[in-house]
Amino acid sequence: MYYNAWYWSGPMGSNRSRPSSTEGLSSLLIPTISAGFPSPAEDYIELGIDLNKYLIRNPISTFFLRVSGNSMNNAGIYNNDLLIIDRSINPHPGHVVVALLDGEFTLKRLIKKKDNYYLKADKENYPAINLYEYVDIQIWGVAIYSIHELKKQKV
């Protein structure tokens, strides 16, 4: 069974926000930065970047959510990250999704084993959630970006 009817049927709470086309998500852009050897080939600098253009494909269907918890750390999603969720993407196995299971939200990876669908944390010590064990299953959206602060490490 493949879930073709992905839908949302209610308010999500205060942890959700929708970007507007007027929000100031722009800044100075240096075209590239080398993490190895610098490139002398750069002969121009773009004056600005509109983060909406790069991060938001469908503004009407895009939301920001704040992550609480660490079960998705191996996917590069950490506690307090800001996720960009696109509800217009049809979820497939392998996607990180926001799911509503019997009224409770969760962020997990959608996987398929044989004919069953599961939601799985990207940490091994968390059990997979069998979607067939729930009455009300809604895949609310697909996580497309995770924004987090880079912390200083002791060296």
Explain the meaning of each model-derived region:
Residues K112-V155:
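Glycine- and charge-enriched low-complexity intrinsically disordered segments
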Residues M1-N73, Q138, Y145-V155:
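Short, positionally conserved secondary-structure boundary motifs
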